[in-house]
């Protein structure tokens, strides 16, 4: 019984030393990229159905955020966690009723030196994100 208690104490000490040093920022950045990609695909489907919704990207000194709006009504506001930046030349992500984007380009989500990218293709309006060997995020 004493061996079991000593073994459990050692395990708790080891876990206590390892867990605080884990950087979850990369996982958060990946999660935000997947969430934003899903939101863009949702907006595209809504615009195909004739609903006039768009995503507006804003950057302040400390935080990045995006807003989902239908004409002038704000539907949703999503702020990026600390140290995660969103950079793009597209300030408004919006699609025609046939699926073509008004502006095509790339949205990048940065955490430290890793870059996660979402690309909106010009003519077809496909929403892609690069992973693995195809991505600049190594």
Question: Where in this protein do the model-derived segments appear?
Answer:
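N-terminal helix-rich module
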Residues: 17-37, 45, 49-54, 58-138
């Amino acid at each position: 019984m004493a061996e079991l208690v000593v073994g459990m104490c050692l395990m708790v000490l080891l876990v206590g030393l390892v867990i605080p040093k884990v950087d979850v920022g990369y996982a958060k950045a990946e999660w935000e990229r997947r969430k934003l990609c899903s939101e863009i695909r949702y907006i595209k489907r809504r615009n195909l159905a004739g609903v006039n919704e768009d995503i507006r990207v804003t950057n302040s000194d400390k935080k990045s955020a995006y807003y989902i709006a239908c004409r002038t009504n704000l539907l949703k506001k999503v702020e990026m966690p600390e140290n995660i930046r969103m950079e793009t030349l597209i300030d408004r992500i919006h699609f025609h009723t046939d699926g073509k984007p008004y502006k095509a380009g790339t949205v990048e989500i940065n955490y430290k030196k890793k870059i996660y990218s979402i690309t909106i293709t010009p003519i077809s309006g496909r929403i892609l994100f690069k992973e693995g060997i195809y991505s600049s995020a190594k």
